[in-house]
Curated annotation (Swiss-Prot):
One of its GO terms (cellular component) is glutaminase complex. Pathway: Cofactor biosynthesis; pyridoxal 5'-phosphate biosynthesis. L-glutamine binds at G46, E47, S48, R107, I138, R139. InterPro entries: Class_I_gatase-like (IPR029062), PdxT/SNO (IPR002161), PdxT/SNO_CS (IPR021196). It comes from the Bacteria. It holds the Pfam family SNO. Disulfide bonds: none annotated. The gene is pdxT. This is Pyridoxal 5'-phosphate synthase subunit PdxT.
């Protein structure tokens, strides 16, 4: 089983470290041919506007969006959540997204870099609960609205939705890969394996 990490910018190495620690075979994805044969892909955090521009530069937008629409499992963190969203509350000028997850997302919902913080978050999906996931929020977004096919899987004490699931897509506002808490990576890899088995 090969899983990719979209390696255009951001926290690429941290996700590769997490996935490889869990026994996954990984591949960096920069151009369309890198998508061939993948059974899942991670879209890391970083800067969502830069991610958008580089994805267009490397012509990876349409092939990636098509694979996701066809059911490719995705794990996205922070800017990755923004990049998947159908709508943004506060897009940068000219900013585009893959528009594959039926959510409205607010960028930088907690303020600038100096307002970044670490906390713990309970995450629940597929009948499993992962209590106290160690989470870094770095210029993090929140989900302000979501459609009927989307499930909220994580929220802060104030009610802010910081994790969603839509089908084979898990998207978080925060960075578990930065903290060494790989439980959500493992749960996503389990989802990838189930999807691969169903495809046989």
């Amino acid at each position: 089983m090969i899983v990719g990490v979209l390696a255009l910018q951001g926290g690429v190495e941290e996700h590769l470290t997490a996935l490889e620690a869990l026994g996954a075979t990984t591949r960096k994805v920069r151009v369309p041919k890198d998508l061939d044969g993948l059974e899942g892909i991670v879209i890391p955090g970083g800067e969502s506007t830069v991610l958008d521009k580089l994805a267009r530069t490397f012509d990876v937008v349409e092939p990636l969006a098509n694979l996701i629409r066809d059911g490719l499992p995705v794990f996205a963190t922070c800017a990755g959540l923004i990049y998947l969203a159908k709508h943004l509350d506060n897009p940068a000028r000219g900013q585009q997204t893959l528009a594959v997850v039926d959510v409205v997302v607010r960028r930088n919902a907690f303020g600038a870099q100096r307002e970044s913080f670490d906390t713990t978050v309970d995450v629940s999906f597929d009948g499993a609960t992962f209590p106290g996931v160690q989470a870094s929020f770095i210029r993090a977004p929140i989900v302000t609205a979501f459609g009927p096919t989307v499930e909220a899987i994580a929220a802060l004490n104030g009610g802010e939705v910081v994790g969603v699931r839509q089908g084979n897509i898990i998207a978080l506002s925060f960075h578990p890969e930065e903290t060494g808490d790989y439980r959500i990576h493992q749960a996503w890899l389990d989802l990838v394996r189930k999807h691969a088995e169903l495809a046989i």
